[in-house]
Amino acid sequence: MLSNTKRTEIKKSQKKAVFETTKLYQIIDESLIAHIAINQDDQPFVIPMLVWRVDNNIYVHGAKNSRLMRALKQGQSCCLTFTLFDGWVLARSAFHHSAHYRSAMVFGQFETIESNAQKNQLLNHFIEQIAPGRSELVRQGDEKELTATELLTMPLTEASVKISNNGVGDEAKDKDIPVWAGVLPYRTIVGPLIDDVEHDRSIPQPDYSSVYGERWYIPK
């Protein structure tokens, strides 16, 4: 269960708060991109980054000389947000139009992964989450590449989750208005694969559908 701290307490629309750790994991794993907020020289920055999870830790990587990596490596406290948009809620009044979404907010400090061997292992884990079996086929990062890459980790010890999925919430006075009401779903579809222009046609396309479930593209 997620702990309720001063920073993670949900004050607006508390009924949308969710405390199951599994929901937090699902949002992180599906969204892939986090917006990371930092403060540098009294100037706020919000930077979108690829983020992946292994057990109860998240990981982010980038060039060592980047603004974000330098700030996070110094142990600066930061906030990350993950958001999945699931659809529009079309009500009978303009005021009650809203959205279905799943969101998570994570607080903490990142720590540096120093070992190149550990970097390689964790980066391969990320590849396997995207394309199972691929890390065994591609060239592994060499010492120069791994040394130039900053890899940081943060435990998921302070986080909140908010989910909106309750459909239309019209007032009684509006329910007789003769207009369609309901949900316009949004869904991210993964695939089909697009070959590189220099792809050797004798190499068959792989099947990565196992990690995407119902989001995998199925031709009609």
Which ranges hold each PLM region?
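C-terminal edge-of-domain segments
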Residues: 1-7, 119-220
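An N-terminal domain-cap segment
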Residues: 4-59, 70
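Catalytic micro-motifs at enzyme active sites that drive phosphoryl/nucleotidyl and oxygen chemistry
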Residues: 38-41, 68, 91-95, 139-141
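Structural motif
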Residues: 57, 77, 109, 150, ...
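Short, structured beta-strand-loop surface elements
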Residues: 65-125
